[in-house]
A protein has these predicted regions:
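Short, glycine/acidic-rich beta->alpha junctions
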Residues: 60-61, 95-99
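Short beta-strand-loop-alpha-helix junction that forms the active-site gateway
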Residues: 81-94
Length: 181
């Protein structure tokens, strides 16, 4: 599944990068170049893999892998590609709640308020696209969460586990054994 998701990302990114050549007013923007041209000196480019760029924001201690940035009809959008099962995809009506913090983080880091989510049904490659406009309130709320988290980290105290956190959210967490105590 991971490899098929990666393959789908690469194919979509490649298709987007070729749109301008066939007359569509859509340009795939190199993220590292965008960071440099916009003088986003607070961001570190940690690497590239195909179209994706690994970025690190030291002040917030956040690293992330950006699928891309597109410029469509003169406007910039952060591109975030998601693949999902037919069951989730069929009922998809907007950006998943689980993806809001991710979009908000990317928006803060890249200075772009609009995120284009492209959800692909991994069973038949059908697609749905949604634009999420990240508001100042969303950014303030996320920064508040990061600050709270940093306080726990600096005090070497694990934060209380939120009641609504899913098991999936804990899968790659370095502290999941501490939470179970």
């Amino acid at each position: 599944i991971c490899e098929s998701g990666t393959d789908r990302h690469e194919r979509i990114q490649r298709a987007v990068s070729q749109m301008q050549a066939i007359g569509i007013d859509c340009e795939y923007v190199d993220v590292a170049q965008f960071v440099q041209e916009r003088e986003l000196n607070y961001l570190q480019v940690r690497g590239k893999s195909g179209f994706e760029t690994k970025l690190y924001y030291p002040e917030l201690n956040i690293s992330f892998l950006c699928d891309g940035i597109i410029k469509y009809k003169g406007k910039y959008y952060i591109l975030e590609i998601k693949t999902e099962s037919i069951y989730k995809w069929q009922s998809r009506e907007f950006v998943a709640d689980d993806h809001l913090n991710q979009a908000t983080t990317y928006s803060i880091c890249l200075g772009l308020d609009d995120v284009l989510f492209l959800y692909e049904n991994r069973d038949n490659c059908d697609k749905k696209a949604y634009i999420l406009h990240v508001t100042e309130d969303m950014k303030a709320e996320l920064l508040k969460k990061v600050e709270e988290c940093d306080t726990y980290v600096s005090n070497l105290i694990p934060p209380p586990k939120p009641a609504d956190v899913s098991k999936k959210a804990c899968t790659y967490c370095s502290y999941k054994t501490v939470c179970k105590k």
